[in-house]
Amino acid sequence: MRFQDMPYERIDFAKVQEEMGELIRELDAAKSGEEQFEVHKKYYALTDRVMTLMTIANIRFDIDTSDKFYEEEHKYYDEQGPVFSNLVLAYQKKLYESPYRAYLEEKIGPVAFKNMELAQKSMSEALIPLMQEENSLTMEYDKLIAGAKIDFDGRELNLSLLRPYLVNSDRNVRRQAWEKMSAFFLENEEQLDTIYDKLVKNRTAQARAMGYENYLELGYYRMNRNCYGKDEVEAFRRQIKEYFVPFAEKLHDRRRQRLGLEKLSYIDEQVYFKDGNPAPTGTPEEIMAAGQKMYRELSPETAEFFDFMMENQLFDVLGRKTKKAGGYMTYLPLYHAPFIFANFNGTSGDVDVITHECGHAFQGYLAAQDPIREHADIGMETAEIHSMSMEFFTEKWMNLFFGDRAQDYVEMHLEDAAAFIPYGCMVDEFQHIVYEHPELTPAERKQAWSRLEREYKPHLDYEGDPFFGQGGFWQKQLHIYDYPLYYIDYCLAQTCALQYKVKMDADFTEAWKSYLKLCRLSASDFYTNMIKEVGLDSPFEPGCVKNIVEKLEKYVK
């Protein structure tokens, strides 16, 4: 079914509560594991319906944040979402404590039961008012960012539409664009500080209500980190500082030389070529058609997937003034349908949507064939391997998008992927500092960010910019506001995707087989087990990062 034809009606959560209560009673009355699993199938049907309708409403609001009807629906789900989470929790608690646990664990898998345990540790009914407040604060941030009106080049632009000017080949244009963006954030600095301060206090209060010292423990549970913790993440970040930061700085210096500059400035970030970054040559329609050709040639599985997405119009990718910033893939379980949301703006980022977000969507499409819904509850550190690796697997088709600048794109993509890892680790370490010290003032948080920038991105020079030069860059990173602690996942995944890059250059067919296997494993096993099973090294293992850097050196000679 096409997305626009999918019917929508507001979910009546009082009715859902009754239905969930009935399922819990049926679990109690069941006389065997088999009977409980039959009840569990009804739970799948109920949660599929709720999640599908909530997701439709949220997508339609994101597509047009000025739509009053879906704004009201979005607010309704922000209020009712935590109530629903609590109903799910009550059901899962009953399942978790089942006398037929051995049968159910064999049927659903040990990962699902570990995740249920983490869910019990991350939520309680007492948190509902705080979670509702948290939702309204993140919505306030989203609306503030989506509502940016920046006069530039004779047009009124939002932040997504300003992006091409930030990487323009003309340094003067870049400087003006960065100054305009800085002015927007400076003008809204007080509101941004207030929203974040309230979020930190709110999340800390949630953690303390659950008996934790600070939000980190609660945040790790909420991110479903079921086979690693803070110590492993810190060890990984240390490896990045020791081996990857020097490698990334080498790449930045190579970029500086290519740009013919004596010194890099912040206005040169993510600019890779003197004559500008490669941009797609076609219209949005031509980019989508090229994507279809590419996925038809890549494999039978990707061909079937992309044709399904196109036939059912499961993309909304054109940038518009009142559209939410950013891009994502989400899933509509009733229709076994992934959905991709993005903001095309004429840069190479448009093609990244067709590779990165389609990597997520392809895995979601494959996972839909698994009747055990819990197998789709993927940790983000695994989910991002699917998307980031697809960016590399599709490289040989880049001529369809970039013409004679395809090789420039491939070089830029590798450098950008490598340069991202220190930034991602910095975002993670910043959040660890913030949540370990919730008493920090907005100014102290910015000082912490500036210190981390010197450690992770020593080449960076803000030239005294009044906003970015004062440690404010993180305020444009929506994950920090909306999805706390969701960022190191990208770094862990990128280290795996870079391993796939090395593997596919040695033997593409074998690398693709390994990737397909990982996609199909979904969340049926723990992250650390799955990456081992498909022949990848764990980023947590000592020496993993050093080994990757040594193999990547050959690409930058």
What are these regions (language model features)?
Residues 255-274, 308-319, 379, 412-414, ...:
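A glycine-rich phosphate-binding loop feature that marks nucleotide/adenosyl-phosphate handling sites
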Residues 359-373, 393:
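Catalytic Zn2+-binding segment of zinc metalloproteases
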Residues 127, 131, 185, 189-193, ...:
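Hydrophobic alpha-helical scaffolding
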Residues 160-172, 280-355, 359-364, 466:
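Active-site-adjacent "gating/activation" loops or surface patches in catalytic cores
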Residues 114-117, 227, 354, 362, ...:
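C-terminal, non-catalytic "cap/extension" segments appended to globular domains
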Residues 122-123, 181-188, 228-234, 269-280, ...:
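Glycine- and acidic
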Residues 1-278, 290:
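A well-structured
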Residues 242-243, 367, 378-407, 413-415, ...:
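Post-HExxH zinc-binding segment in Zn-dependent metallohydrolases
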